[in-house]
């Protein structure tokens, strides 16, 4: 065992030496010096990644750090070489037929950059070694086998350096590699080195390509080239562009999995830039699970995954047209009204609808949505499909809804809130073929940004409970955010933090950020300290897709991918739609006071709808007459609904669950009910909720507590608070009601008084005596009619969750317990709003 351990250490040292040699020679090619400590890295971050079992997800990039705008960045001179007019990479990518047109020179969205390389590169070699040890040569090119054998045999740093020099000087012709591969002979070591350098370059794009993605529709963001993406750093020169390199085909995902072991450097660079530096920037290499990374890589790097056929593109066009014309119609009809329009991010609508259709195809029956005021009316009209005449009625201050018994809205169902805070619930046909019924529910929310987040999650959890959706497949939550709020509001982290907690897990949330690059009047550099507004989502290893808000197909694809991720892995995903806000914070606000340069650009900017219409006309998918006809059809429909709204009288509460039907209004009297329980039933319940299996070994003090409670229930004397509480819960459960209690340390009780959950002192197994009441009649899905759970150390988020849970069905007891009385003030927004 000691020998095996020392051998492993030796291999790791050899692998580390190989990586440092590669990096050192690459740095020499750029005439820039850097200490070994800076490159290799050390400390806790390295130790964290060394424990990672799979292929490294952090080879060419690491933490970003802020620098002064007027100061030199570390490595900026190297990045300048990448941007130089004579740079071979720039010409290579520009001349490639498979890439997009070269973008204008960008400028930093944030003053950050990634350091290049650290010791995680060793983890990459260790992963190759692990596969080699498990499978031998199966599915692996001989070149890797030879490399690992050399490392096992103690290859020296001098030998590695010599191999590098040969490769650097062009002494490794591909013909020799091909001949060796055909003959089954070992591939020359210099070919191995070149392959390794190319794989590091590929990994750099997977890690940091998003930094160079063209996601800003205004083109105002200037970005310095990340030095990790410069091929010269890896020792390649312009003469290597049309050379072929061996990359192998063994068990790789993405484009490297294609049956094409040899690639030219030009093709590789073209494919990488097209994939990672286009209108979508993918952040996923922070995810530690190899299966998840490989799944995403396969979706992202396979071009055939992203295409839309002619029919689907026409649908995207119509939905985009409806989004823009809805805002235009409201602007013309209600010139001075606040509506917090979606102009500048209209692609949200077709993208959101694409996610809903995909969800329906995957079996989703219910979608619970939470969102702020921005674009809310457009989502209500075009995604949820709330009747347009209802929306127009609310604009002109029409009559309030009336209840089933004819009571006025103010007494029963009406809301005094503004129209862009109201919710609704609509069932409609969705799916690719519009043949599946899906209920979409938008929760009402206050002006307090993000406060509705955990309320939505809680309602979703309750719906999953009552639908018996154990697999979390049919009920899903969707949360929309603003960029300033997503990075600024603490409730966002509280929501993310509870995403994988046992009694708060809802199978993942789809997060959509409407990133208009300004928070009311505040620029991003004054509202966050991170590179992206979405960086907080990395704490739960959620993938983040940054997408250009002018590219409707890219937005639709990102939404679809995020939805499929949620359904497959039951985890959160984030779509960051980088867009702009055409007007001020509201329509009567003047944005030129605070963002004059941005709004000069916005005034000249062509809308996404106009851009897409022009694109489809150019490609022959639509004619100019067809575009005009569709626009006229939509405007006519809006005008018809507007006329109908003049006589519209709402008849029901469309934002309230059907479970609440039949409840009395505040000014109605209900009959007095007997709340007492027969003493015989009390004793029976008391006996059951104090039973502990003989095979279970509770703590001796806990056993005394339960023995004392049994005596209380038998005699009816000296019943304390905790015993009375358990008896109350027990009688409700006995009648078939659902009881849920959560909060900090509620299972035991802050003062060690409750002990609703007890632990076996030998095995650690949990036992809940209250579940004795229905354990013999539990249904096939094991429904937990009684739930008690310790929460995260949060008040705001957890109370919001429990409030949302209580909204779905009034026939249940849902309790949040503040650990101490004044701790409730940390959740004051939920209490007040």
Residue ranges and their predicted role:
Residues 595-596, 600-601:
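Glycine-rich loop/linker segments at domain edges
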Residues 579:
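Flexible glycine-/small-residue-rich
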Residues 518-520, 554, 582-583:
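Short gly/pro/ser/thr-enriched loop/turn and capping motifs at secondary-structure boundaries
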Residues 546, 554, 559-567, 572, ...:
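C-terminal catalytic or substrate-handling cores of phosphate/nucleotide-
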Residues 2-29, 35-57, 61-63, 69-72, ...:
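Conserved internal helical-beta-strand scaffold that buttresses enzyme catalytic cores
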Residues 549:
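Active-site donor-binding loop signature of nucleotide-sugar glycosyltransferases
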Residues 195, 552-559, 609:
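Amphipathic alpha-helical transducer elements in NTP-driven molecular machines
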